[in-house]
Amino acid sequence: LPLDDLSDT
């Protein structure tokens, strides 16, 4: 799951 806003990381 994306832990950031849009980033997939």
Curated annotation (Swiss-Prot):
It comes from the Eukaryota. One of its GO terms (cellular component) is extracellular region. Expressed by the venom gland. The keyword Mitochondrion does not apply. The keyword Nuclease does not apply. Keywords: Antimicrobial, Secreted. It is found in: Secreted. This is U1-poneritoxin-Dq1b. The lineage of its organism: Eukaryota, Metazoa, Ecdysozoa, Arthropoda, Hexapoda.
